[in-house]
Amino acid sequence: RVGRWVAIAGCGHTEITDAVVKPVLSCTVIGKSKRLIASSGAKSGDDLVMTKYAGLEGTSIFASDKIEKLKNISEDTLKEARDLSNLLSVVKEGKIASQMGANAMHDVTEGGILGACWEVATCSGLGVEVYADKIPVLDCTKQICSELGVNPLRLISSGSMVIAIENGEELVAELAKNGINATVIGKFTNDGLYIVNKGEKQALDEPDVDELYRV
């Protein structure tokens, strides 16, 4: 089916190599938008909203690819973790956030939720305060990350999105009406990149190697 659409598009390149053991498909889409919401559009005073949960994709990958290191985790928990792969699209929340007047949006991939917060703040030329205790983490993610010794807040989190918007709670309520969990986890400021944990401020560092690659 992919080959049929490539033929219709009139382009494509296929290569077979021993180094790649699974199919890899990439594409570039060019189009027009009435309003572009980039990662660089956050404004000082905006709420920082996060959709879904930290570490979604990383949790699913671990539960599928690192079974030999997760023998202490129940099969029910592993199944729940693997099923998180069904939550990786952010199209729905992106459309809603756009309609609600979001100033910036960024999908959370490598570097995890903390990396995404750092990226939006620096791209926007702002500071940010991220409230660590507000970041939602599923129990299956906590169990698996604890077993593997990794930080879920620095784990690839495709399926989650960070959004800068003036009234975060209104967006959270609208997303909830559409079955999407969302949480206000911080605020954009004029300067300073911080994680606030139990009332204490710590520097929010530039993202390093994703926790996925440390296992």
Annotate each predicted stretch with a short phrase:
Residues 176-215:
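Acidic, Ser/Thr/Pro-rich beta/coil linker or hinge segments at domain junctions
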